[in-house]
């Protein structure tokens, strides 16, 4: 079963990740990983840091000649902006009057600053914000891209896209395949499946930036061809939809998760929500609709998995809100760090990545994942077993 850990601060020397449980024999496409990292840096409404960073991953363990070994995979992503913060973010040199000049003592409402400082005893809130920054998600995207490549070898494909930015909702054809969605969102810089609203949303983001404010939005992820039976109804913590919800909520700024119709299902009758069952001699078992987003009883049911995430607006405001200085206890405006007007576009890449990670975790927990060929054979045999059930 796969697991991972990340380390590193936003303006530290680098981000580091260790991914365990990936089968041996997977031919990694490094360019594809870097393409995912570049997509995370894109999108209308990003801040100036994206002009500094040009993220590329370096594999330093667990891969030989481009092929995974089955051992832990170690990855790094350099922080180019560290050159401007080398003294302030030096991991080793003792603190001095010079390298502590940019202390943060005015916590930002909505950020981890104040509570993180209280919990860990930090008087310089930079010690909190450097790790709680969404910069860390670059490594989760790199790890998620590896998982996506493994899923593709099992003919499982997924995509994350933007469904809403601020008050602007996009009406999309929910029956589109992953390939069709990918083709549509590639046509604009907001990852929208319908480009009609792009000019209007550009104007909204520009006006919001001028006002010193920020915007959130809604992300939708669709995964196709996931076999039925991943996860389990037998205990609360083995339900895969619960694990997906936890992973999505673990992404910075996410405040809500829906599976399938989610909260909308609560306002309908059961006869309108439950997905009727069908069977075909060739295709096997299916559902006539997909209101439940590919899950029943905490298990995948073979239909496309649909996960939606609500992202709050970024808490760093260029027109800062009221706060209190933790050193003087005097009421002041919150501190300002370089930030984005909206990060909903990169967040869609991050949420897509963590969904890929959790699906890979479930697959490698269910089937022998020692090497890719065996995993493919086992999953293929399992699919046939389900078809004949």
Curated annotation (Swiss-Prot):
HAMAP family: Chorismate_synth. Keywords: Amino-acid biosynthesis, Aromatic amino acid biosynthesis, FAD, Flavoprotein, FMN, Lyase, NADP. Pfam families: Chorismate_synt. CDD domains: Chorismate_synthase. This reaction introduces a second double bond into the aromatic ring system. Reduced FMN (FMNH(2)). The keyword Lyase applies. NADP(+) binds at residues 40, 46. FMN binds at residues 131-133, 252-253, 297, 312-316, 338. Its EC number is 4.2.3.5. GO terms for cellular component: cytosol. One of its GO terms (molecular function) is FMN binding. It catalyses: 5-O-(1-carboxyvinyl)-3-phosphoshikimate = chorismate + phosphate. Pathway: Metabolic intermediate biosynthesis; chorismate biosynthesis; chorismate from D-erythrose 4-phosphate and phosphoenolpyruvate: step 7/7. This is Chorismate synthase. The keyword Flavoprotein applies. InterPro entries: Chorismate_synth, Chorismate_synth_AroC_sf, Chorismate_synthase_CS. PANTHER family: CHORISMATE SYNTHASE. Its cofactor is FMNH2. Belongs to the chorismate synthase family. GO terms for biological process: amino acid biosynthetic process; aromatic amino acid family biosynthetic process; chorismate biosynthetic process. Homotetramer.
């Amino acid at each position: 079963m796969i697991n991972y850990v990340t380390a590193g601060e936003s303006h530290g020397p680098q981000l580091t990740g260790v991914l365990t449980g990936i089968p041996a024999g997977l031919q990694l496409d490094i360019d594809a990983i870097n393409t995912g990292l570049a997509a995370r840096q894109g999108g209308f409404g990003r801040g100036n840091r994206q002009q500094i960073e040009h993220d590329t991953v370096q594999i330093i363990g667990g891969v030989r000649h481009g092929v995974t070994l089955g051992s832990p995979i170690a990855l790094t992503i350099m922080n180019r902006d560290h050159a401007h913060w080398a003294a302030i973010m030096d991991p080793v040199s003792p603190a001095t009057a010079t390298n502590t000049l940019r202390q943060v003592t005015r916590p930002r409402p909505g950020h981890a600053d104040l509570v993180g400082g209280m919990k860990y005893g930090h008087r310089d809130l930079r010690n909190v914000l450097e790790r709680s920054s969404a910069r860390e998600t670059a490594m989760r995207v790199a790890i998620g891209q590896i998982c996506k490549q493994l899923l593709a070898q099992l003919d499982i494909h997924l995509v994350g896209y933007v469904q809403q930015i601020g008050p602007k909702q996009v009406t999309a054809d929910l029956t589109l395949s992953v390939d069709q969605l990918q083709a549509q969102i590639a046509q604009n810089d907001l990852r929208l499946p319908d480009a009609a609203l792009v000019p209007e949303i550009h104007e909204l983001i520009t006006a919001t930036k001028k006002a010193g404010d920020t915007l959130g939005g809604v992300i939708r992820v669709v995964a196709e061809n996931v076999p039925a039976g991943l996860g389990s109804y037998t205990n609360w913590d083995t339900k895969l939809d619960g694990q997906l919800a936890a992973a999505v909520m673990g992404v910075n700024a996410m405040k809500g998760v829906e599976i399938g119709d989610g909260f909308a299902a609560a306002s309908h009758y059961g006869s309108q929500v439950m997905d009727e069952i069908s069977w075909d001699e060739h295709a096997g078992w299916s559902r006539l609709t997909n209101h439940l987003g590919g899950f029943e009883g905490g298990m995948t049911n073979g239909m496309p998995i649909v996960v939606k995430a609500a992202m709050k607006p970024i808490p760093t405001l260029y027109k800062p809100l009221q706060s209190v200085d933790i050193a003087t206890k005097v009421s002041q405006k919150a501190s300002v760090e370089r930030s984005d007007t909206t990060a909903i576009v990169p967040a869609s890449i991050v949420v897509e990545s963590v969904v890929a990670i959790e699906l890979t975790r479930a697959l490698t927990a269910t089937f022998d994942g020692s090497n890719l060929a065996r995993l493919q054979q086992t999953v293929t045999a399992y699919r046939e077993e389900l078809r004949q059930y």
